[in-house]
Amino acid sequence: MTIKIGSRESKLAVAQSELIMDAIRRAHPQVELTLVTMKTTGDKILDRTLEQIGGKGLFVRELDQALRDGRADFTVHSLKDLPMETPEDLPLVAFSKREDPRDCLVLPQGAAELDPKKPIGCASKRRQLQLKALYPHMDTAPVRGNVLTRLKKLDSGEFSALVLAAAGLKRLGLEGRITRYFAPTELLPAAGQGIMAVQTRKGMDLSCLAGVGDPDAACCALAERAFVRALGGGCTSPVAAHATVEGETLTLTGLYVSEDETIIRRGSRTGAKQDAESLGEALAQALSQGGEDDAR
């Protein structure tokens, strides 16, 4: 029997799916795999920002349907693009080892510095809000499309720079385009950034995933997503969360942004990694209520 892996059809999505497929083949050489690609709603609508399109699951609806009707047995997602709530019949069953979680700055080819006359292109409110503190004299502007499309827009002169996820550039072999990395203390990543998630339908045989997932990445994912979920946020909201694991201890840093964007607080909590979800919920409550965490 051949196992069908569903993916968005962008070059990055395919590269990510192939990484998961390679991991399955290494752990289970006897398993036969095939890749099934498709366009999602978020891939088709490129003339508006994600916030303007509205709704959840812009990059997953078609993949979810493929799981339900049997066109795919598993789907691979960049975890940061997944809605915080996933359908009960379509559980997340594995999380990859985390690639570089940082955001990075990319200048046009041949440029040595930012052009103050042009905006910095970024795809999320989360990045826009944090960039204001880093580059107070620069404007930001939304940019849509896959990574290669965005880079073409940058190199054609539309933007002074782009802010992108380092993991995506590395997975595409484009690490050389990175001008500088933003430490999480400067620009807190999106929940799940750098982690790939495997989703399936209830009742599927999961034996082919044995040895594929990373337990520490799973704990980080649970904490980060619990934080965002507790604040009522989604994959397009400006809140951010990033967790690290040392031994049995998990440290979570979160960014809270009020609805009118006048209050921005950042704070951290540390606890046992088996309590990842409750840690995320507790930090969300503390920051939303203006607790003693490192609010700013």
Predicted regions and their residues:
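Short, structured active-site "lid" loops
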Residues: D47-F74
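Short glycine-rich, flexible loops that bind phosphorylated cofactors or substrates
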Residues: P83-M84, R171
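Paired acidic/hydrophobic, glycine-rich loop segments that form the ligand-binding mouth/hinge
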Residues: R68, D73-S78, S160-A165
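Small-molecule-sensing regulatory modules
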Residues: M1-K39, K44-I45, Q52, Q128, ...
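Short gly/ser/thr-rich secondary-structure transition/capping motifs
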Residues: L58, D103-L105, P142-G145
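Short, well-ordered beta-strand segments
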Residues: K4-G6, T75, V93, G121, ...
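A conserved helix-loop-strand patch within extracytoplasmic ligand-binding domains
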Residues: L79-L82, E88-M138
